[in-house]
């Protein structure tokens, strides 16, 4: 055997060995192997992962929105209760210097005109134009039987204490801002006319009864005339017992 044939045979053996090894390796990595199929089945696809992330974000946003709405409603209720309590406290609290303040500023409506505004007893069946179910001053609902004062022109109704307190410092309706100056001037003008009519001087007749003074009563006694008799008549004032002294002198 020559030296040239040895390398060729060795090279052929090496090629056969490598070819068998590669084919055996390919058989081990068969694409139809159960383990390989299971690995492909378990691996999640990118589309499914994206959909899961999107649904999770939507649920989180909805949860945050619902929690925010609940917190806003609770905060609104707390603020409303606090304002209602503070308003009722201010109404029930006496104002010591109210007369002096009104005298100096003269902003509110006089009590004489305020008392002429109509007062009604509230009932849910009432159907008055402009009358609501809530007092906008104290933010509390009207209860059946409560006394409400109605303002002229706009016919808006409020609690008597609330609107009296308001109109002591303002001249307008707290809801529609309707000015009440003309109405008050008309009411006060009618009052002034009524006062002038009642203030006219009247004639007063005074009858004084004075007791009568005692008067003198004259009693004359006539006796038959005799020659020797002289009749003397004396006039004396009336005594308390009504006795009359008659003196007859016989000469």
Curated annotation (Swiss-Prot):
Keyword Transmembrane helix in record: yes
Assigned GO CC terms: membrane
Compartments, record wording: Membrane
Reaction catalysed by this enzyme: S-ubiquitinyl-[E2 ubiquitin-conjugating enzyme]-L-cysteine + [acceptor protein]-L-lysine = [E2 ubiquitin-conjugating enzyme]-L-cysteine + N(6)-ubiquitinyl-[acceptor protein]-L-lysine
This enzyme's EC code(s): 2.3.2.27
Record has Zinc as a keyword: yes
GO molecular function: transferase activity; zinc ion binding
Record InterPro entries: ATL10/ATL72-79-like, Znf_RING, Znf_RING/FYVE/PHD
Pathway it works in: Protein modification; protein ubiquitination
Gene3D superfamilies: Zinc/RING finger domain, C3HC4 (zinc finger) (3.30.40.10)
Coiled coil: none
TM spans (from-to): 59-79
ZnF bounds (RING-type): 135-177
Membrane topology, as annotated: Single-pass membrane protein
Keywords: Membrane, Metal-binding, Transferase, Transmembrane, Transmembrane helix, Ubl conjugation pathway, Zinc, Zinc-finger
SMART domains: RING
Family per record: Belongs to the RING-type zinc finger family. ATL subfamily.
Entry comment, domain topic: The RING-type zinc finger domain mediates binding to an E2 ubiquitin-conjugating enzyme.
UniProt-recorded name of the protein: RING-H2 finger protein ATL10
Source organism phylogeny: Eukaryota, Viridiplantae, Streptophyta, Embryophyta, Tracheophyta
